[in-house]
Swiss-Prot record:
This is D(1B) dopamine receptor. Brain and kidney. It comes from Xenopus laevis (African clawed frog). GO terms for molecular function: dopamine neurotransmitter receptor activity, coupled via Gs; G protein-coupled receptor activity. Belongs to the G-protein coupled receptor 1 family. Glycans are attached at residue 24. The keyword Glycoprotein applies.
Length: 457
């Protein structure tokens, strides 16, 4: 049978519908769109609120722990951890909430506060990154020259380093922003600012590149160099300690004529050495990986956006523009680093005990640490007593009193030492320790008188 409407497309069929039907469909689509928008706003707001509260909680916990417990407060190096926590706390207080409200509302509702907020954003983010850089330099200095570090790293020196980082953060934020040196001079930017409810933080090319160099690229280069050298020091000293452990175990085992035991000890020590090297590499990879993954995408875009072609007839045509949504996502990725720093830098053994005391969760808190984080702070420790260096030497001499003469003269394993960490779990001497040569101390196994009379020749 012939059907008169079977060859008509959807637009032609719609033209035959009554105005009431079309209006109802339009209202239905609009209602559905609003529901999806509200649902998206609720999800976005909830996630951002959770991120802000976690950042506040973690960094307040770090600051409270150091202020309330004297043994943490007495360590000079914890000043750097507190400074990092303060900068991250300011990110959560002065930067995140205002942007979160703007994300949910869909516009900037705070008017002229935009310029001050931009200055706070640049200052707090830069301070956080520079504090991470200072911590890496502090750790490298402590590991490469521990005795010199113990003498020269005073509270005054630490405060001077921190003050320099904060002063630089203020200089590249408030002064340029208040003098409007940071703004893009295009008509698009001038017309799309506070009057349209948009806090456009578009930067001119000169300021975008110079501020990115100071805030990120130079600090990340320093961190890569320092942590690479820390890994090399750790790798060398793990092998040296493993050599001494094998010699000591060989002497003790062969003293009882246990040949099979000698071979087993050698294989076990070699596996332990490889395991410890892997731990150090994993630790440093986490520290650098988290930092780079959070901040690198933003700073790449930050340098790209000023060179964008914003309109077809733009006089400074260049790269295609990045969408505002994409840019905002990577901005939040950078700020999220402030929520991860307390986990990475403060969750070592000492801090975990204090946190469990503050939170009142006792045994449950102390038995649920993140293992990788624990490794990161105990392998790269810089709060230990330098007397432990001498203890290691004495212990090894007691274990292998006269076997020292059998060691090749070219291998002065403990001419000068530096400690990276100290084990306490099973009393294995220097199992998780790493040593580094230091020109200020002359400790040689050949120069120490054996303390046991029944040594093996």
């Amino acid at each position: 049978m012939y059907q008169p409407f079977q060859h008509l497309d959807s637009d032609q069929v719609a033209s035959w519908q009554s105005p009431e039907m079309l209006m109802n469909k339009s209202v239905s689509r609009e209602s559905q769109r609003r529901k999806e928008l509200v649902a998206g706003q609720i999800v976005t707001g909830s996630l951002l609120l959770l991120l802000i509260f976690w950042t506040l909680f973690g960094n307040i916990l770090v600051c409270t722990a150091v202020m309330r417990f004297r043994h943490l407060r007495s360590r000079v190096t914890n000043i750097f951890i507190v400074s990092l926590a303060v900068s991250d706390l300011l990110v959560a207080l002065l930067v995140m909430p205002w942007k979160a409200v703007a994300e949910v509302a869909g516009h900037w509702p705070f008017g002229a506060f935009c310029d001050i907020w931009v200055a706070f954003d640049i200052m707090c983010s830069t301070a956080s990154i520079l504090n991470l850089c200072v911590i890496s330099v502090d750790r490298y200095w402590a590991i490469s020259s521990p005795f010199r570090y113990e003498r020269k790293m005073t509270q005054r020196v630490a405060l001077l380093m921190i003050s320099t980082a904060w002063a630089l953060s203020v200089l590249i934020s408030f002064i340029p922003v208040q003098l409007s040196w940071h703004k893009s001079e295009t008509e698009d930017h001038l017309l799309s600012n506070h009057s349209t409810g948009n806090c456009d933080s578009s930067l001119n090319r000169t300021y975008a590149i110079s501020s990115s160099l100071i805030s990120f690229y130079i600090p990340v280069a320093i961190m890569i160099v320092t942590y690479t050298r820390i890994y090399r020091i750790a790798q060398i000293q793990i092998k040296r300690i493993s050599t001494l452990e094998r010699a000591a175990e060989h002497a003790q085992s062969c003293r009882s004529n246990r040949v099979d035991s000698c071979s087993r000890h050698h294989q076990t020590s070699l596996r332990t050495s490889i395991k410890k090297e892997t731990k150090v590499l994993k630790t440093l990879s986490i520290i650098m990986g988290v930092f780079v993954c959070c901040w690198l995408p933003f700073f790449i875009l930050n340098c790209m956006v000023p060179f964008c072609d914003r309109s077809p007839g733009h006089p400074q045509a260049g790269l295609p523009c990045v969408s505002e949504t994409t840019f905002d996502i990577f901005v939040w990725f950078g700020w999220a680093n402030s929520s991860l720093n307390p986990i990475i830098y403060a969750f070592n053994a000492d801090f975990r005990k204090v946190f469990s005391s503050l939170l009142g969760c006792g045994h449950w808190c102390s038995t649920t640490p993140v293992e990788t984080v624990n490794i990161s702070n105990e392998l790269i420790s810089y709060n230990q007593d330098t007397l432990f260096h001498k203890d290691i030497v004495t212990a090894y001499v007691n274990m292998i009193p006269n076997v020292v003469d059998c060691i090749d003269d070219n291998e002065d394993a403990f001419d000068h030492m530096s400690q990276i960490s100290q084990t306490s779990a099973n009393n294995e001497l220097a199992t998780d320790s790493m040593c580094e040569l230091d020109s200020e101390v002359d400790i040689s196994l050949h120069k120490i008188t054996p303390s046991m009379s029944n040594g093996i020749h």
